[in-house]
Design a protein with these regions (language model features):
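Conserved acidic residues
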Residues: 110
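Short catalytic micro-motifs in class I SAM-dependent methyltransferases
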Residues: 116-120
Length: 204
């Protein structure tokens, strides 16, 4: 799917579906917060949430005391929703409206977090470009947290095909650039009650 088509798709999603109804909704992103906690990052650490949209991860990280947060999303509507929800605290966050494949990092991030953006990249050239961008943005002592549908997960998400990964497959794809520190599988229960099987990896 071309970049402009991807943008139109996600703008429609965020303009028509309330946060609490989308399949990826989490009132508290427990897995991401647990993985971040084990890193013992400084509160001044630069963290970027790729494809973060209006996820509540940013709210929780702000509440924990993190001061250098960036949220990147292809959808301006998603970012506006997040800003509205955060109110005055939205000024504490760097908001980046961009397709991840068009993103040109101008700084480095000690943590790159991505829950369910990477798995929408289904062509080798897209995956290669994503990893090149991430490698440019993450210093050698930095970390990457990646969540994607597992090999037991559904073949589509929000009406789009996804690339599913076991822990070993995710490790293999990222191996040229990153080393796996910890991997896990888990089930996410959507607001409608369906189960989505995820693979998460913590890399450096």
């Amino acid at each position: 799917m071309p970049s402009n088509s991807r943008k139109l798709h996600w703008e429609e999603v965020y303009q028509t579906k309330p946060l609490e109804t989308v399949g990826w909704y989490q009132p508290k992103p427990e897995t991401s917060l647990s993985l971040i906690s084990r890193l013992e990052l400084s509160f001044d650490a630069a963290i970027i949430d790729v494809g973060g949209g209006d996820s509540l991860l940013t709210d929780h990280l702000l509440n924990l005391g993190f001061k250098d947060l960036s949220v990147l999303d292809i959808s301006g509507a998603a970012l506006r929703r997040a800003k509205t929800r955060l109110g005055i605290r939205s000024g504490e966050v760097h908001w980046l409206e961009s397709d991840i494949l068009d993103f040109e990092p101008v700084r480095s991030y000690e943590l790159w977090h991505d829950r369910a953006t990477f798995h929408f990249l289904t062509h080798p050239a897209q995956i290669k470009k994503y990893l090149e961008i991430a490698r440019k943005a993450i210093p050698h002592d930095g970390f990457l947290i990646l969540g994607a549908f597992s090999d037991k997960g559904p073949p589509t998400c929000s009406g789009l095909p996804v690339q599913r990964y076991s822990i070993l497959e995710l490790q293999r794809v990222l191996a040229p650039h990153f080393d796996l520190i910890h991997g896990l599988n888990l089930d996410h229960i959507t607001p409608s009650g369906s189960v989505q099987a995820y693979t998460f990896g913590l890399f450096q």
